[in-house]
Amino acid sequence: MGPRRVIDAGAMLLVFAAGTLGGAMNALAGGGTFATLPALIAIGLPANIANATSNVALLPGAAASAHGYRDELAPLGGVDWRVLAAITFVAGLAGSILLVLTPTRAFDLIIPWLLLIALIAMLGGKRAADWLAARVTIGPRSLLAVQALLGVYGGYFGGGVGLMMTALYGLLAGIGVRAMFAPRTMMLAVANSAAALVFVATGMVRWPAALPMIAGAILGGWGGALIGRALPPLLVRWWTLAVTGATTAVFFARAYG
């Protein structure tokens, strides 16, 4: 089915609800893409168009979060955060251009594997980082190289990249989870912004779907921040894993079933 330029009331309600859920998930633990992407595909958008539209829809929430952490930004692993941001922006541009050049059918086959990578990062990223940190010493150059790869991934797809940053920053920069909130949030916003520029310029965003999703994501981000103060962290984690696991299974069945 080709992408719809106009969506009906039911589809609009669906993408608004998905945006609300995605915004809340991002505010709580990340993984909002796993709520927004399936909804956009369900209303008839090709996977690559849905991915681009989802990126733009979730960007205001990411930007607002980054702005909120601006006073906490500091060097990460001995590297100025501005240098990391510049690398992330260029890498995000490269990743998003790669998506634009990827045929729709090819992306249909690739995306389940990207989702699986994100799921693995959620399940074992922190443990793997702790295991490596006890055995290897990694310096600023490795951090720059890894940040470039994360930027490309964030521009191309982005699902789970925040969780990957959480795990890898702990390994490469040797900082705790709380200290990495500010740089991680900023790098996510930078990668998303770079990708959004490319997606908008190349006409990959379906605005009739993006606009209600943006509204939902803003509402969900606000509500998620409030709810997050009351929910046990373990419950948030298992909910995120459940949504991600179910989404991954559906996309594998869709691509290879």
Spans of model-derived segments:
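Membrane-interface alpha-helices at helix entry/exit sites of multi-pass transporters
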Residues: 45-55, 77-83, 174-185
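Selective hydrophobic functional segments
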Residues: 53-106, 192-235, 239-242
